[in-house]
Amino acid sequence: MGRSLKKGPYIDPSVEKKILAMNEKGEKKVFKTWARDCTIFPEMVGHTIAVHNGKTHVPVYITEEMVGHKLGEFAPTRTFRGHGGDERSSRVR
């Protein structure tokens, strides 16, 4: 279930402040954030943000298609190691 429209999107104040300051200066620096719940807003397009995945910071390049999504959606927290194990070799032939 999404967030209520009357509340508006959640934008982390520190992320917003850094992005707006970089846009004024014309910089494109990578900065770290732990705010996985921050909604991506249009001013972020073209920036790279290092989003924490619980272990490390994953660099996420923001494109126009990402606007409206959350930062955490692009920094996976779990590593997929494949389905099952050595099933075929353990079966009796």
UniProtKB/Swiss-Prot annotation:
Pfam families xrefs: Ribosomal_S19
GO BP terms: ribosomal small subunit assembly; translation
Domain of life, source organism: Bacteria
GO MF terms held by the record: rRNA binding; structural constituent of ribosome
Entry keyword annotation includes Ribosomal protein: yes
GO CC annotation: cytoplasm; small ribosomal subunit
Entry keyword Lipid metabolism: no
Cystines in this chain: none
Alphabetized InterPro entries for the sequence: Ribosomal_uS19, Ribosomal_uS19_bac-type, Ribosomal_uS19_CS, Ribosomal_uS19_SF
Transmembrane intervals: none
Keywords: Ribonucleoprotein, Ribosomal protein, RNA-binding, rRNA-binding
PANTHER family, sorted: RIBOSOMAL PROTEIN S19P FAMILY MEMBER, SMALL RIBOSOMAL SUBUNIT PROTEIN US19M
Assigned protein family: Belongs to the universal ribosomal protein uS19 family.
HAMAP family: Ribosomal_uS19
NCBIfam families: rpsS_bact
Function: Protein S19 forms a complex with S13 that binds strongly to the 16S ribosomal RNA.
Protein name: Small ribosomal subunit protein uS19
Species for this entry: Symbiobacterium thermophilum (strain DSM 24528 / JCM 14929 / IAM 14863 / T)
